[in-house]
A protein has these predicted regions:
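Extreme N-terminal leader/activation tails
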Residues: 1-34
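Short amphipathic alpha-helical "recognition" segments used for binding
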Residues: 9, 19, 47, 65, ...
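N-terminal segment of the canonical double-stranded RNA-binding domain
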Residues: 14, 26-100
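Ampiphathic alpha-helical segments that act as solvent-exposed interaction surfaces
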Residues: 95-116
Length: 116
């Protein structure tokens, strides 16, 4: 299993842990990530924790610097369920846009990430 596959599996597993598995971009441009598998993913990206209360927080600009503009996470009112890859949105388990599931989109994004 590649590093990208391992990270993707860890990210997918985090949705069963009861914590956020995605981040919320706040008004300060931070991506807030509550304790979950995303902690390890953020650390693997070498991003600083801004110590936002109750969450891990990363500057959106740092996320984009590490991953490019193609990837960041958001949380919707119905739950934590979307990932943005390029200009396509992927809802859990559904094939939309260019036909990728969000898991496939994440793996593709990881493979394109600098340093990988």
């Amino acid at each position: 299993m590649t590093t990208n596959e391992t990270l993707a599996r860890r990210w997918l597993a985090s949705k069963h842990w009861g914590g956020w598995r995605v981040g919320m971009v706040d008004t300060c441009g931070r991506v807030n990530v509550a304790p979950s598998g995303m902690d390890a993913l953020g650390e693997s990206m070498g991003l600083p924790d801004l110590d936002h209360p109750g969450t891990r927080a990363f500057l959106l600009e740092d996320v984009r610097r590490a991953w490019g503009d193609a990837v960041y996470w958001m949380s919707g009112p119905g739950g934590h369920h979307v990932v943005k890859c390029g200009y396509q949105w992927f809802n859990e388990g559904k094939r939309v846009g260019n036909g990728l599931t969000e898991a496939e989109a994440l793996v593709a994004a990881l493979e394109a990430a600098p340093g990988e």
